[in-house]
């Protein structure tokens, strides 16, 4: 059964765009159009432990680093900046690093799996993706940029898990597929792209085409050792699509999870990767689980039972429709579109904190 555990009054002075729990589910970070980030204890009183001020515009998203690096939090904003914060206690926070080399709003940030070190990916409306790597011994940051990652802008970014599928399940799993760093991004060109690090450069490995409008969110599912990878994508076109690959990530197939009543803004996997939470313009949060036949079913909030969603397994979509939608957005897109309007971006989900 799904039920409300707690309600927190953040006391932000404007729209709250995103909330994220830390690795242990104890500290909650929120961000808002008031330009601030606030830290709460998720299991105690509702008063903010700290208020982080450093942005001069709406803050779209926050992301926690793995606790092996300490209490580290990243935030991104319409002001084109990414700020990495560090705390000695939940109440005492300082600015560890500030990155300001994007030409437009920074819409999404995501820390890499801890096996790769302290690495942060950033997605921007200027069409590029930045990968920031910290040398933790010297406290020096290095930035690499993927220019022109998406036409018009990049809305979302997510890392591939470092843990590879178990070779015991599939002999096609190789050490190469396990060791290579990968990212998935979604953009205003209606595309989903998978990027691979190759000789200190980031190259486009796959281009996934199925959405007919802006891709608002992407989420690479946590690995539990099974011989496949899954990526969920959410779009303005009201669809959530789950992409699945074979063990060596050489081929991807798409399945439409559901067609919603309004645009879909945010998606989040459970820590075990078997439940997907979805929220969007219909002001609802729904939970979905894949059955043994590969069909996605919605979990009933009242009883905890599953309800099958009658959807086509694949979404028909032509290249000409994609081009038409892209041209329409090119004509309408502002110079700094940001991730979305306030009303759209108010329903983002906390990352990977769902119960399974």
UniProtKB/Swiss-Prot annotation:
Compositionally biased residues, Low complexity: 308-356
Segments of this protein annotated with the region Disordered: 307-356
Consequences of knocking out this gene: RNAi-mediated knockdown in the larva results in reduced transcription of developmental genes Eip74EF and Eip75B in the salivary glands, compromised transcriptional recovery after heat shock and defective recruitment of Nup98.
Subcellular location: Nucleus envelope; Nucleus, Nucleoplasm; Cytoplasm, Cytoskeleton, Microtubule organizing center, Centrosome; Nucleus, Nuclear pore complex
Keywords (A to Z) from UniProt: Cytoplasm, Cytoplasmic vesicle, Cytoskeleton, Developmental protein, Endoplasmic reticulum, Lysosome, Membrane, mRNA transport, Nuclear pore complex, Nucleus, Protein transport, Repeat, Transcription, Transcription regulation, Translocation, Transport, WD repeat
Family under the similarity heading: Belongs to the WD repeat SEC13 family.
Protein name: Protein SEC13 homolog
Organism: Drosophila melanogaster (Fruit fly)
Gene: Sec13
